[in-house]
């Protein structure tokens, strides 16, 4: 068995798992290859249990794909307790040179003694696991109207860490680029200073680290490590909800880092004040810096994403195929990437050129499901639930603001997500004229430019309906 097995397995797993799963549960594993066995060593029992229950079958499948002949057995075990990153070395003295004069030796001993005395006050820097995905950079990030403000702010944070945009909080739905931007900042910080103490982790990993530190009486090391970072990047902060002890520890870590002008970057699937189960004092502090949203990609951005990803995957994507996919799939970047991979694989397996007809064949079940989900009736029900009114109100003749605006929103979304004509949409909304639908579409488009709340409602509803 070669020593290249585990890196190849990692590539297989990175392709099939989402970023959160891969970075939180797979990256921390260490691999030892011996006697036709792949020993995977987890840094904690918590991670071992999760991998064993949730991901072991996928790991074994990836191992088989890499080594179908003499496939090694996969075993899991917990390593000696220590999250490598926050263990201090037992001996930090500088190794002595092979040849030295008496004067040089005395000087070295004096320096070592001085270093030893200062150890408790200023622990030495050491290499730590940053957990960054080096593929997620600003260069590989596709910008559009939906994320250009977030991208510009992220670059500012990378240029001036610990500055006015601290903390930097990015929120939005799944697969819209929050994690990519977070890693891009981290990678840029590491590029500029390879010795920077930058760490990315999922909020669940922070909780797991703290639990293990408490269990093994290592809480002081845990605190010292996280509070000594130059930049702390925590994904999906909403998972801190209702975990009081974790919130307490993070609160103090957060304060220490900000007081030291160290950068904190956070993400969530919603606006921080809307995260239920999160302490008010944390929500308040998250607002000290810059909070910014990423929205679902607009049509032009979806096309750009498809073109760029196709180039990365190594196949030519004709414009008309990119337009076809972008028009019919309005979800997140991950959905687009998945659809593109399917089209590319279908073309390779059938040895055909990538055309619109081929894309229709490759995506027919996905498109059928999307069409089944996105109906006028479904749009009406979703909008009514969102605004806490009845579908009957949308179809009625009532013209009060609390009914008229959701009705206009429903019509605009119907025009955006379905192929129904204006008269058909009007007929579905209580027999209204097509000019009423046209007015509603124009009104919502105008309001999206001037009213942030309307724009947020529109994007949230699109996300709910298409996902």
Curated annotation (Swiss-Prot):
InterPro entries, alphabetized: AAA+_ATPase (IPR003593), Chromosome_initiator_DnaA (IPR001957), Chromosome_initiator_DnaA-like (IPR020591), Chromosome_initiator_DnaA_CS (IPR018312), DnaA_C (IPR013159), DnaA_dom (IPR013317), DnaA_N_dom (IPR024633), DnaA_N_sf (IPR038454)
One Pfam family linked to the record: Bac_DnaA
Region (Domain III, AAA+ region): 131-347
Subcellular locations according to the entry: Cytoplasm
Keyword Nucleotide-binding in record: yes
Gene Ontology biological process terms from the UniProt entry: DNA replication initiation; regulation of DNA replication
Chain positions covered by the region annotation Domain I, interacts with DnaA modulators: 1-85
Chain segments carrying region Domain IV, binds dsDNA: 348-467
Broad class of where this protein is predominantly found: cytoplasm
Region (Domain II): 85-130
Entry's family note: Belongs to the DnaA family.
PANTHER family linked to this entry: CHROMOSOMAL REPLICATION INITIATOR PROTEIN DNAA
Free-text note on domains in this protein's UniProt record: Domain I is involved in oligomerization and binding regulators, domain II is flexibile and of varying length in different bacteria, domain III forms the AAA+ region, while domain IV binds dsDNA.
Assembly and oligomerization: Oligomerizes as a right-handed, spiral filament on DNA at oriC.
Name by which UniProt lists this protein: Chromosomal replication initiator protein DnaA
């Amino acid at each position: 068995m070669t020593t290249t097995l585990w890196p190849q397995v990692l590539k297989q797993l990175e392709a099939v798992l989402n970023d959160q799963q891969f970075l939180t549960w797979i990256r921390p594993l260490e691999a030892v290859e011996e006697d036709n066995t792949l020993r995977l060593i987890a840094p904690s029992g918590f991670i071992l249990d999760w991998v064993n229950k949730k991901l072991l079958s996928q790991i074994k499948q990836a191992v088989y794909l890499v080594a179908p002949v003499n496939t090694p057995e996969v075993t899991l075990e917990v390593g000696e307790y220590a999250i490598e990153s926050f263990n201090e070395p037992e001996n930090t003295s500088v190794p002595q040179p092979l040849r030295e004069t008496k004067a040089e030796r005395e000087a070295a001993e004096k320096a070592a003694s001085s270093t030893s005395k200062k150890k408790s006050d200023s622990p030495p820097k050491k290499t730590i696991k940053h957990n960054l995905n080096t593929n997620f950079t600003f260069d590989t990030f596709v910008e559009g109207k939906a994320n250009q403000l977030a991208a510009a702010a992220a670059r500012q944070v990378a240029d001036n860490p610990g500055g006015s945009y601290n903390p930097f909080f990015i929120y939005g739905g799944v697969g819209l680029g929050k994690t990519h931007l977070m890693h891009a900042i981290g990678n840029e910080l590491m590029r500029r200073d390879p010795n920077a103490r930058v760490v990315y982790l999922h909020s669940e990993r922070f909780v797991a680290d703290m639990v293990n530190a408490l269990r093994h009486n290592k809480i002081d090391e845990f605190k010292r490590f996280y509070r000594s970072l130059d930049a702390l990047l925590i994904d999906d902060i909403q998972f801190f909800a209702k975990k009081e002890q974790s919130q307490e520890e993070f609160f103090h870590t957060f304060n220490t880092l900000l007081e030291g002008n160290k950068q904190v970057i956070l993400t969530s699937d919603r606006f921080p004040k809307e995260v239920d189960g999160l302490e008010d004092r944390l929500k308040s502090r998250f607002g000290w810096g810059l909070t910014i949203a990423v929205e679902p990609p607009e049509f032009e951005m979806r096309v750009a994403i498809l073109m760029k990803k196709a180039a990365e995957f190594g196949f030519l994507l004709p414009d008309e195929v990119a337009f076809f996919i972008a028009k019919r799939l309005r979800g997140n970047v991950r959905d687009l990437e998945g659809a593109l991979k399917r089209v590319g694989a279908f073309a390779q397996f059938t040895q055909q050129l990538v055309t619109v007809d081929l894309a229709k064949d490759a995506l027919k079940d996905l498109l059928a499901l999307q069409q089944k989900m996105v109906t006028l009736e479904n749009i009406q029900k979703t909008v009514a639930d969102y605004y806490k009114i009845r579908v009957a109100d949308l179809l009625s003749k009532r013209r009060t603001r609390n009914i008229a605006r959701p009705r206009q929103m429903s019509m605009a979304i119907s025009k955006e997500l379905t192929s129904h004509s204006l008269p058909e949409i009007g007929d579905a909304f209580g027999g209204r004229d097509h000019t009423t639908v046209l007015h509603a579409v124009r009104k919502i488009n105008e309001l999206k430019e001037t009213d942030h709340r309307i724009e947020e409602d529109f994007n949230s509803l699109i996300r709910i309906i298409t996902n």
